[in-house]
Amino acid sequence: MSEIVFAIPGDLSLPTGGYAYDRRLLAEWREMGVAARHLPLPGGFPTPSEVDLAETGRAILSQPYDGVLLIDGLAYGAFPESVAAGLAGRVVALVHHPLGLETGLSPKQAAEFVRREMAALHYASAVVVTSETTKRLLAADFAVPAERVTVAEPGVDPAERAAGSGGKTVELLAVGSLVPRKGYDVLIAALEGLADKPWRLTIVGADDRAPATTAALMAQIAATGLSGRVRLAGALGQAELDAAYANADLFVMPSLFEGYGMVLTEALARGLPILCTTGGAATETAPDDAALKVPPGDVGALRAGLARLLDDPKERRQRADAAWHAAGALPRWRRTATIVAEVCAKVSP
């Protein structure tokens, strides 16, 4: 294998879990001496135009044949079957989560994403996923043989334990882009019924990826009378994000589905108690003793979980201790990068 050509659509600097994973692979490989480079693809994926597809074809076909193509699933899952077939024998597909499981799609759109991604994955020599949950999902619903799928869980860096706010008001923190799948509307609906309790919520995440969702969330916050208690912080730099984690008393993740849930391990690394859903891999990412878990999309269950933890500082401390204990066993990025590089080496033409 001469090198890994890592094809990634859109802006690699965007503050999402998927792009963070991709950035970290490239950074680790540089330190490890693994020959790898980033091949930018158009930003129109997963709904590319004909121009996007033509540009993608030119970019990929211009790569040396002895390099292995590692293609982010945001693009590869949307490739027409004819394009995927033409790359057979050279591709490792990186699936963060199946495209058809994104919330907010019509049934027709979701079915088309599933059909196209299933067809493309048939031609991938190997598939890398970020969780055992996604591996099982690809085997069950996308006809991908389990022996072709390798799990490379995201790593996490060691961090200082969160000190918390130190006040009587419980500081809630949620991290993730404002997109339908993150379930922030469910969180606000749950908190609406807890106005008599002492809490404040900060949501950190890009607010420009789904403008309609952001507008609806802002309107919901205003309509529920929670504007003074809910802060939409937008995307933050690393120092500001670290400060938000350090000041938090409880981490909340109301996602409807997660292919892994990298923010959960970031919370664990800082010893934060967690309230999360069982959507996708989230139920496995956070240990049961560190996280109170509720079904995704269930306003009543989320409200009950919030009330329980807001009312019981002792339980929050116990779950915080469990999270801090789990932090020492979390995977590191060097191991993640090694696993993916080994998969690519086996596929090298």
Task: Annotate each PLM feature.
Residues L264, P273-C276:
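Short hydrophobic beta-strand element within catalytic cores of glycosyltransferases
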Residues L256:
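Aromatic "clamp/platform" in nucleotide-sugar-dependent glycosyltransferases that forms part
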Residues T133, G155:
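Carbohydrate-associated surface elements
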